[in-house]
Amino acid sequence: MGPPMKIEDVRRTAYSMPLTNPAFPPGPYRFFDREYFIITYRTDPEALATIVPEPLEVAEPLVKYEFIRMPDSTGFGDYTETGQVIPVRFKGEEGGYTHAMYLDDEAPIAGGRELWGFPKKLARPKIEVESDVLVGSLHYGSVLCASATMGYKHHKVDHDTVLKSMASPNFILKIIPHVDGSPRICELVRFHLDDVVLKEAWTGPAALGLFPHALCDVARLPVREVISALHFKADLTLGLGSVAFDYMAK
């Protein structure tokens, strides 16, 4: 048995919950062979306007629907993720706003929500190769909510183009409630991907279907036209964030 826990001990060791056995370890968080499958599509401008918060501005009526396979990550392990990222501008700088994410692993859900403010929910995303097709799917429970396909490795993509897009800032709306349910933290968080090593990048013909669901509303941003598709692998570090805008500041 150790000594009794003092107030100073709580302040010194507090990081995540449970206090003595946190749901995720401290970073840095390095990802190896992180696999992306991204379909960029055109959607309704009116739908985007109801979702993207000020002071962000919608750059174009586009959405990037992303599937990400993470077989080897420090602290977070082996998992798959999917979600929607919206191209935006913040003070004249172009970046991406992460609107919603769905994944299958507790540690990155807890860490993502608590540290950065990622809008993560538990679901069953999947990436796999079926014969000559790259397939991405999202099930929420037993219900199919998203289905994406792409011709497998048809054409190489210029690495500089992909690296430039990965260097852009990313934005998230972090919300942590007070004990009475009112917002205690409400911030626009900015983060970057660091130390990126791009291993391969491909494109091909693609299709995307989004289907209505009450609690997994990816179809709220409907697909009007598929613009492009991208499939690539990289090693990278998920950098910690900074506060770009504080909604609670007077």
UniProtKB/Swiss-Prot annotation:
InterPro entries, sorted: Acetoacetate_decarboxylase, Acetoacetate_decarboxylase_bac, ADC_dom_sf
What residues sit in the active site?
120 (schiff-base intermediate with acetoacetate)
Keywords linked to the UniProt accession: Decarboxylase, Lyase, Schiff base
Q: Does the keyword Lyase apply?
A: yes
E.C. code: 4.1.1.4
Q: Which reaction does it catalyse?
A: acetoacetate + H(+) = acetone + CO2
Q: Per its record, what are the GO molecular function terms?
A: acetoacetate decarboxylase activity
| Class of the enzyme per the UniProt entry, highest EC level | lyase
Regarding protein family, the annotation reads: Belongs to the ADC family.
Q: Which HAMAP family match?
A: ADC
What function does the entry list? Catalyzes the conversion of acetoacetate to acetone and carbon dioxide.
- Protein's recorded name: Acetoacetate decarboxylase 1
Q: Which organism is it from?
A: Bradyrhizobium diazoefficiens (strain JCM 10833 / BCRC 13528 / IAM 13628 / NBRC 14792 / USDA 110)
